[in-house]
Swiss-Prot record:
The keyword Cell inner membrane does not apply. Gene3D superfamilies: 3.30.230.10. It comes from Stenotrophomonas maltophilia (strain R551-3). Consists of a catalytic RNA component (M1 or rnpB) and a protein subunit. This is Ribonuclease P protein component. Residues 119-152 are annotated as: Disordered. GO terms for cellular component: ribonuclease P complex. Belongs to the RnpA family. It catalyses: Endonucleolytic cleavage of RNA, removing 5'-extranucleotides from tRNA precursor. InterPro entries: Ribosomal_Su5_D2-typ_SF, Ribsml_uS5_D2-typ_fold_subgr, RNase_P, RNase_P_CS. PROSITE patterns: RIBONUCLEASE_P (PS00648).
Length: 152
């Protein structure tokens, strides 16, 4: 039995399933590409759903095609709560056959960020300091400590 966090599962409602749904996404979606895959996104009012197209041209062996799909489903499962709503369809390219699982995952996340469907991660050190901690001013010179003002 799957005891994973229910918010991290990949339920039927999170999938693009029918030919009509795929056609709607392909005909009206924004598209971005990468050497490993193409991502189509059709914004909608419902939570993010994922469709996968991994043909035999990508990998003639079912094991390889299933690995690519498994990695992409897992990436969606981990990031679904942060994603913009809508339908996403990934069309894998033949370069994905030789890519590592991490390369496939990173390519998927990179494409989501390019579509602005996933927020970009913050860089360490970019957060403002907590209240009560003085920060140097960029517009005023720093006060000199230990020197008295000149007499007039």
């Amino acid at each position: 039995m799957n005891t994973a966090d229910p918010r991290k599962r990949f339920p039927r409602s999170a999938r693009v399933r029918t030919r009509a749904e795929y056609s709607t996404v392909f005909n009206g979606a924004r598209r971005v590409s990468d050497p490993l895959m193409t991502l189509h996104w059709l914004p909608a009012d419902r939570p993010a759903r994922l469709g996968l197209a991994v043909s035999r041209k990508v990998d003639p062996h079912a094991v390889g095609r299933n690995r690519i799909k498994r990695v992409l489903r897992d990436a969606l499962r981990q990031t679904r709560t942060d994603m913009q709503p809508g339908d996403f369809v990934v069309v894998a390219r033949s370069a994905a056959r030789n890519a590592s699982n991490d390369d496939i995952r990173q390519a998927f996340l990179r494409l989501l960020r390019r579509l602005r469907a996933l927020p970009t991660p913050g860089v360490d050190g970019t957060m403002p300091p907590p209240d009560g901690i003085a920060t140097p001013s960029l517009t005023e010179p720093a006060p000199r400590s230990g020197t008295a003002e000149p007499a007039r």
